[in-house]
A protein has these predicted regions:
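Accessory terminal and edge-of-domain segments that mediate assembly/interaction
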Residues: 1-299, 307-484
Length: 484
């Protein structure tokens, strides 16, 4: 392992990370091209010496800081020692890494080192964005002679608190191999470049929210007073103020090719909004959060539809989840359902205040349309067919609404330390005979979607103003890595 042996500043560390990463990526691409064109195998001795490896970032603390900050949710050491991780795409993560390093460098006097690791970059992750042209017949040979993805080396043990103490402590929740794995999946599922993702995320489970988001987004990028400068759409479409007929340029066929298409309303400072249509079901919700978490978003909110479970609710009312009954089952092995998922005060307050502001219902009046309570998330699309069992469970939990995604998203936020929240809109009341019918559904959608989406956007504006205060200490484990 190469060691420069000098204490780097955060800026120097980032420059060195980018330098080492680019060296490895270029070497791997050149070796692949030489193999494809000439059949030349990579030099095994050069590989042993780190020809294709990720750079590693290490931060050491001697425990001498007299008064380490206790109120921050990140940028803290739990004990003296050396913390390390491997890094991929340092240019993409530069702002994030710089923020984290500056905190420990200035507050703790931490020692920062950058060197080459022993973990090789899998070849599939360097092909995109290069001039390499490969066909399927080459796959077996490349897998045999070049580093490739090994699932045994990829996991969420650190995020789940399952890592085994050793010589080094983990510096971050995700190492380079885990990050690269998810970056590739994000592009595949959403149809957009990972560079376009914004830190404030809205999830929805209905395409009509997408239509409204696109309409509003296009109006924003034409407004000279708006901070939004572009709209990145699933299928590789990029809309700016110069785009003629922007809504017509966004093809339905483009996003329909992707399982969970995304749209990114971009700001010049990278503090915009991403909307992901996750479709229906907890499996999709888990999948997108597994991969989106590596980008370390500032918040994700579920803005979708639900079934109202209380007689006093009306179609079009809102539900602000403050607790979850997790009948989704997709996370039971890593986060048992008896583990409580706490609500995040800052997020709850933002969603509540945004609902008051957008609906125009001040003070106590907003409670006529906004119900706070427990949301059930189920993995059974036809839960109504087991009415006797379902009704008893709903009654015991005091649930006010049911859907198929919200608890999964909240649980994933809890796992990955991403602030989370849920504001749902009642689209039917199956326990009280008000079920979805085609004509009723259309009238409901037309009246509710615009306001509901605007509440989500307004909540993001409020949360953006919170800055680092948005991140909650209640999501920290006992041995939390220093980086957010």
């Amino acid at each position: 392992m190469e060691n420069k042996g000098t204490n780097l500043t955060p800026e120097q560390a980032l420059d060195r990370l980018e330098e080492l990463y680019e060296q490895s990526v270029n070497a791997l691409r050149e070796a692949i091209a030489d193999y494809v064109d000439n059949g030349t195998l990579p030099d095994p001795h050069a590989r042993l010496n780190g020809l294709f490896v990720y750079p590693s970032l290490s931060v050491s603390w001697d425990g001498a800081t007299p008064n380490p900050p206790k109120t921050r949710a990140f940028g803290r050491f739990t004990h003296p020692g050396c913390y390390t991780t491997t890094v991929t795409r340092p240019a993409l993560f530069r702002a994030y890494l710089l923020e984290q390093l500056n905190l420990v460098y200035h507050d703790y006097g931490a020692y920062i080192a950058v060197e080459s690791s022993h973990h090789e970059i899998p070849y599939p992750y360097v092909i995109d964005g290069s001039a390499l042209t490969l066909d399927r017949s080459m796959s077996a040979g490349l897998t045999r002679h070049f580093p490739t993805t090994e699932l045994a080396q990829i996991g969420d043990e650190t995020a789940d608190g399952l890592f085994h103490p050793g010589e080094f402590y983990p510096l971050s929740h995700f190492d380079a191999r885990r990050v690269d794995f998810s970056l590739a999946r994000l592009r595949h599922y959403t149809g957009t470049p990972v560079e376009h993702f914004q830190p404030f995320v809205l999830f929805t489970n209905y395409t009509r929210y997408v239509d409204e988001f696109v309409r509003w987004g296009c109006s924003q990028i034409l407004d000279p007073d708006s901070p939004y400068i572009a709209l990145s759409c699933a299928g590789g479409i990029w809309i700016t103020a110069e785009t003629e007929a922007p809504e017509e340029a966004i093809s339905d066929l483009a996003w329909k090719k992707h399982q969970m298409p995304a749209w990114h309303l971009v700001t010049a400072d990278g503090q915009g909004i991403t909307l992901v249509n996750i479709g229906v079901g907890p499996s999709n919700a888990k999948t997108i959060c597994d991969h989106l978490a590596v980008l370390r978003p500032d918040v994700w909110l579920m803005i979708g539809h639900c079934g109202g479970l209380r007689e006093s609710q009306a179609i079009g009312d809102y539900v602000l989840a403050h607790a979850y009954l997790r009948d989704d089952h997709v996370l039971d092995a890593v986060l048992p359902p008896d583990i409580p998922i706490p609500s995040i005060a800052e997020v709850q307050r933002a969603l509540y205040d945004a609902t008051k502001a957008v609906s125009g219902m001040p003070g106590e009046e907003v409670k006529q349309r906004l119900r706070t309570g427990t949301v059930v998330t189920t993995d059974d699309r036809n839960w109504e067919l087991r009415y006797s069992a379902s009704a008893l469970r709903f009654n015991l939990s005091r649930a006010v609404a049911i859907d198929m995604e919200s608890a999964t998203i909240a649980a994933q936020g809890y796992r990955f330390r991403v602030p989370y929240g849920t504001l749902l809109c009642v689209s039917d009341k199956p326990l009280h005979g008000e079920i979805k019918l085609p004509g009723q559904a259309n009238r409901f959608y037309e009246g509710a979607i615009s306001e509901h989406l605007q509440i989500g956007i307004r909540a993001i504006d409020l949360l953006r103003a919170e800055g680092d205060r948005l991140h909650s200490r209640k999501l920290r484990t006992f041995n939390e890595p220093p980086f957010r």
